[in-house]
């Protein structure tokens, strides 16, 4: 069964189309209008072995907030749709990723209960054209749209570029683990409830 989802969303502020393949090879075709954001999404795709197409037209003449937040909403919806009924998958995933002086932790639970715990400290307002405060907004939107429990924590380091990049890559690795099949589940959902 292919685990591919395409989700579109159009508002007065943004026009977004995302296609996500959970069982890809790490290919990305990205155009958000924010170069550093594209770079982060490319890292996510490559390190999680997801194929990701993300086309965004946003009101960047205002600022990047709507573009980044709305991309997170659509991205989360694509994850939820691609994951499907969650039968046979690990459900949980975690990764601790080093990037030079930075160490980032990410843990994911595809529980159907949205929650974000984001503990990263930034020292500059922007990296490239991406407002650093929007990194949390992106992950918040992803977690709530995907209905996932998501923890991202900076364990060490101070370079904002490295912190953000490590967070995106750790998220990719954790989500890859959470979406992998475990044959011991025999197609069942990993929950005492029988469903998620």
Please place each PLM-identified region on the residue numbering.
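N-terminal intrinsically disordered, cationic/polar leader segments
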Residues: 1-196
